[in-house]
Amino acid sequence: MPARISRATYAQMFGPTVGDKVRLADTDLIIEVERDLTTYGEEVKFGGGKVIRDGMGQSQLSRAEGAMDTVITNALILDHSGIYKADIGLLDGRIALIGKAGNPDTQPGISIIIGPGTEIIAGEGKIVTAGGIDTHVHFISPQQVDEALNAGITCMVGGGTGPAHGTLATTCTPGPWHIARLIQSFDGLPMNIGVFGKGNASLPGALEEMVRAGACGLKLHEDWGCTPAAIDNCLSVADHFDVQVAIHTDTLNEGGFVEDTLNAFKGRTIHSFHTEGAGGGHAPDIIRVCQYPNVLPASTNPTRPYTVNTIAEHLDMLMVCHHLSPAIPEDIAFAESRIRKETIAAEDILHDMGAFSIISSDSQAMGRVGEMIIRCWQTADKMKKQRGSLPDDRPGNDNYRARRYIAKYTINPAIAHGMAHEIGSVEVGKRADLVLWNSAFFGVKPDMVLLGGWIATAPMGDANGSIPTPQPMHTRPMFGSFGKALTNTSITFVSQAAMDEGLREKIGVDKQLVAVVNTRGGIGKHSMILNNAMPQMEVDPETYEVRADGELLTCEPVDVVPMAQRYFLF
């Protein structure tokens, strides 16, 4: 006879099911379970007296006979594709199956086999997301990787050589020698990583050698001279090699105005960094580029969301990052031209509309690498409070808004940089770069981070304790962050040209190299999932007011944000 239990008891035992609602951290964002791929009465759970035991939920089948390496049980998946509950089977470091796990000899409807060789990760009451992808990283210090991984980021794309002054300001690694050294360093860093070469040149030769040396993209930055000639040349090289171009345009409008930059694009696909402009770009109207079908517009997190402190902190940040002097009036004028409350306020709304497609960090160069995910959800929460529910949200939940915002740091950056065949979503066939969250700590402090199907970092107590939880309890590197496990569970993204030239053997790295694909004409703004709006944009050159399809975009700064001091005492 089937037994009935209360919804609350069920959720406590097996996690939420269809119709149950979950609050994300301390925000006002509520998600609702849309479907459940597990079977009531046949749920699998590990532990003493539980289901996953020999002859019960655990079969006799070997790995060769179809048993998984790892199963995450009863997980609530939050992905751009939907919000649903399922068991997740991992094999060879990839997501092999999503559905119902158990023992096919004793249970009906089993698609994911648990065998004697299967490890179990308890997903009951946990939210599972794809690992975050940060596509605007200044590689100033390797310690950024620890901060990023512990925040739920599993892929970092950017450039640099360490605390050199070129790197402090610009997100690119200049030349094949530096690119090789940086890629070699990745063998010691538990993270999927890609490198931008410097894209500022008016002739192709130097850019071509950087792509062949392992750059998975090129970065154009105003501090190196972002002229129409450099833009045109860089995009031509990118088209030839199928790599993405990221751009930080000319704030001072010395080499041309935003129209000149758009003309230099010639309709070719490009990733526009900090499209609002406080992070850099044509003053005051770089924000207009989000209306074009070939531009993939992004924000960096220092302006996310617009708060009472946003303007005040930017001036000093900018002076330091771009090697400016407070003693030089022209330097101060340059800095002040980039910081406009009107465009920052509009940026909040453009994200909520889905007109801005990506959020990244700008790590240690005006942005905080460990706060990319936090700032994204703070923006979503602020917009719900100020603008209400989105038209596509159903009464009682914020599922559509949640899917829109998670896409900004998972699938959309993966698509933009030719990595979506490997990462960016909780999807069968992709790498098992997954993050488990306690809902109360969602977006703030992960419960566990998997790289290539193995645990890379997790909260852990005193290693001399009799159990894993005695204080001090904090996030620590796990076995996936050491030795050859590290190099076998994370990858480096490069160009296909570098693969063809045998880069891995040439520079002697252990990590697997994976080529980026489909970064050029095959993608555009239409490819940005749930974030492909292209409103007609106008910016008043005197008041800086921003309009989209004729509507004034403005909102008030907030003085309190969620996911903040409640979670961080120090």
Curated annotation (Swiss-Prot):
Its cofactor is Ni cation. It comes from Brucella melitensis biotype 1 (strain ATCC 23456 / CCUG 17765 / NCTC 10094 / 16M). Keywords: Cytoplasm, Hydrolase, Metal-binding, Nickel. The modification N6-carboxylysine is found at K219. Ni(2+) 1 binds at H136, H138, K219, D362. It is an enzyme of class 3 (hydrolase). GO terms for molecular function: nickel cation binding; urease activity. Substrate binds at H221. The keyword Chaperone does not apply. It catalyses: urea + 2 H2O + H(+) = hydrogencarbonate + 2 NH4(+). Its main location: cytoplasm. Carboxylation allows a single lysine to coordinate two nickel ions. Gene3D superfamilies: Metal-dependent hydrolases (3.20.20.140), Urease, subunit C, domain 1 (2.30.40.10). Residues 131-570 form the Urease domain. Heterotrimer of UreA (gamma), UreB (beta) and UreC (alpha) subunits. Three heterotrimers associate to form the active enzyme. The keyword Hydrolase applies. InterPro entries: Amidohydro-rel, Metal-dep_hydrolase_composite, Metal_Hydrolase, Urease_alpha_N_dom, Urease_alpha_subunit, Urease_AS, Urease_asu, Urease_asu_c. PANTHER family: UREASE. This is Urease subunit alpha 1. Ni(2+) 2 binds at K219, H248, H274. Its EC number is 3.5.1.5. The active site is at H322. GO terms for cellular component: cytoplasm. It is found in: Cytoplasm. Belongs to the metallo-dependent hydrolases superfamily. Urease alpha subunit family.
